[in-house]
Each structure stands twice: as structure tokens, then as C-alpha cells.
């Protein structure tokens, strides 16, 4: 082999190693930033101090929830993780599962849980895998979580064989609910669902965030991140696909989104609504940012949610 050819091959291999090393670094950085449940998420959410009034209101809602006939319940899922939920006991057979969002936890949904309890529901509020008191190290973006919601539905039926169940989720919880709606194992006792500001898929959401936060295209950064996620978390980001799931759903669904949402962009709700099989309704809340629809116009929000659920339970 000529010396010049060897030099060219050597340079090419060196560049390939550098590129692969860079992609490996980028993939691991993304995994740590977005999927590792224990890492700092301030790059995504910023370091703004929370409004003291909002913090106090959240504490008050939690205390109100725990002052009801509320207990901690536990379930071991098919992957061996011990999962936690709050269960608000009441009379009757009308149940609702309330699902929190990304890096949140069950206790942060206390305001919603209290509302449904006041409407006569028996309420189950799970900590999703790797959140709150539930075990796990990686955030599932709905891929795993939707399977856990199916199992929580079966848990309810063990407590109450005559149960009629609704699903309600916000943000990642909304996408989890949508993914669960298309799961063939979802019990027939689940009658209706409400999704508030869910994303079409984890892939689409992270593509948006890569561009919004870093000005990067999805290829090759997200492909590298997905490779690392498959290695370290054991799932493919493309499996967290709410858009594919709603095409197969067999239950009515109310889609809600704020028209000022710049975290899960409002444009995501339209293909979800269009693709959804079966009975469906769409509510766009003017001026509402991500997860803020019920704060911007609480009367209209709860009137719509309650009336929609009431048609099927």
C-alpha cells in the first residue's frame, strides 16, 4: 500500500473516531439531561424561583387531599419496580386515574385529585416510574408508563369489580394516557379519557426541544441520543408514540391544549385530534401556556371536563 494511501486512510479513521466520539458524547449528554431521572433538569426548565403563593397553594391542596380518606397504595409492575399511588376512597363505582407530567409527582396533582373527589370519583393518583415514591432510574416518556397505567386499571378492578374508570393526564401524563388508550390490554372498564397538552411522540418533543434550546437538528443528535437511551434505559424513543396510539383507541377522548404553549407546541394537538379514532372533542384555551389551561379559565375548563366525563361514566 502506498504511503499516501495509508495517510489518507489514517486521517479518515481518525475523523471517523472523532465523529463517533462526538456523537457518543452528545448521546450521553442528552440521556443524562432528559432521560436520567436523577439528573439536574435546570437546562430545560431554568432556575426561576417558584411563586411562593403557588407553592403554598400546592401544599394546601396536598394537605386537603391527605385529609380525605386517602391512603398510600403500592404495586409491583411487570419489570419488578415497586410503584406508588395515592388512593382517595369514596362510595360508588366511578373511578379516575390522574397522571402527572415530566419530572413531577403524584402529590403535585392534589388540586386535580380534590376536584374529582368533590365530583364523586374514587381517585387514584400514581407516581409514574422513576418519579415521586416509585422506583426506577430512567424516565419512560410514556412508553413504559402507559403499560403501568394499564396495570393500575387492573388494580382498581381487583378492588372494585364493578368499576367504571376514566383516565386524565397532563403533559407527559397526557401522552401516557393517549398511549394507554391504544393498548390492547386496557380493560373494557376504562370508558373515557382526557388529555391536556400531551405531545405527539417523545421523538417529536425532543426534536422540538433540541431546536428550541440548542438550535440543533434532530439528525444526528437525536439519533445518537436514542442509541444511548436504548442501551441505558432499554427502550426506543420512537416507542413513546401517542399519535400512533390514538389511531387505535377505542374510548372517547377530550383533547385540551393552550394556544400559548411553547413547551409542547400547540400545533401538536391538531394531528393528534385528526388521527384519533372514535368519539373525540377538542378544546383550545386562549392565552394558556403549558399545563396552564385550568388556571387561565378554570370555570370553562372544569365545566368542559366534567360534562365530557359525565357522558360516559
Predicted regions and their residues:
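Hydrolase active-site cap/lid region
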Residues: 179-235
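The serine-hydrolase catalytic nucleophile loop
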Residues: 102-115
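Alpha/beta-hydrolase active-site loop
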Residues: 139-160
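Short beta-strand/loop motif that positions the catalytic acidic residue
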Residues: 248-250, 255-257, 261
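An N-terminal hydrophobic leader/cap segment in hydrolases
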Residues: 18-76
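Conserved alpha/beta-hydrolase
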Residues: 113-135
Amino acid at each position: 500500500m502506498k504511503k499516501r494511501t495509508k495517510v489518507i486512510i489514517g486521517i479518515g479513521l481518525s475523523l471517523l473516531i472523532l465523529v463517533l466520539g462526538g456523537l457518543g458524547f452528545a448521546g450521553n449528554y442528552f440521556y443524562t439531561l432528559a432521560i436520567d431521572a436523577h439528573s439536574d433538569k435546570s437546562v430545560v426548565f431554568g432556575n426561576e424561583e417558584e411563586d411562593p403563593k403557588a407553592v403554598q397553594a400546592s401544599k394546601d391542596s396536598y394537605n386537603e387531599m391527605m385529609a380525605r380518606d386517602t391512603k398510600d397504595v403500592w404495586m409491583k409492575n411487570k419489570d419488578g419496580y415497586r410503584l406508588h399511588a395515592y388512593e382517595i376512597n369514596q362510595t360508588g363505582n366511578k373511578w379516575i386515574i390522574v397522571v402527572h407530567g415530566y419530572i413531577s409527582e403524584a402529590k403535585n396533582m392534589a388540586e386535580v385529585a380534590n376536584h374529582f373527589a368533590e365530583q364523586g370519583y374514587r381517585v387514584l393518583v400514581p407516581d409514574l416510574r422513576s418519579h415521586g415514591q416509585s422506583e426506577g432510574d430512567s424516565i419512560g416518556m410514556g412508553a413504559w408508563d402507559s403499560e403501568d397505567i394499564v396495570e393500575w386499571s387492573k388494580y382498581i378492578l381487583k378492588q372494585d369489580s364493578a368499576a367504571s374508570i376514566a383516565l386524565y393526564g397532563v403533559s407527559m401524563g397526557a401522552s401516557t394516557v393517549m398511549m394507554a388508550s391504544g393498548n390492547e390490554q386496557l380493560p373494557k372498564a376504562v370508558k373515557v379519557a382526557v388529555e391536556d397538552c400531551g405531545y405527539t411522540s417523545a421523538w417529536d418533543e425532543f426534536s422540538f426541544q433540541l431546536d428550541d434550546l440548542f438550535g440543533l437538528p434532530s439528525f444526528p443528535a437525536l439519533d445518537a441520543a436514542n442509541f444511548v437511551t436504548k442501551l441505558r434505559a432499554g427502550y426506543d424513543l420512537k416507542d413513546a408514540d401517542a399519535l400512533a396510539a390514538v389511531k387505535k383507541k377505542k374510548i372517547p377522548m377530550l383533547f385540551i391544549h393552550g394556544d400559548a404553549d411553547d413547551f409542547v407546541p400547540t400545533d401538536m394537538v391538531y394531528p393528534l385530534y385528526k388521527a384519533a379514532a372514535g368519539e373525540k372533542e377538542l378544546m383550545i384555551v386562549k392565552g394558556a401556556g403549558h399545563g396552564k389551561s385550568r388556571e387561565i379559565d378554570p370555570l370553562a375548563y372544569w365545566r368542559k371536563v366534567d360534562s365530557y366525563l359525565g357522558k360516559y361514566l
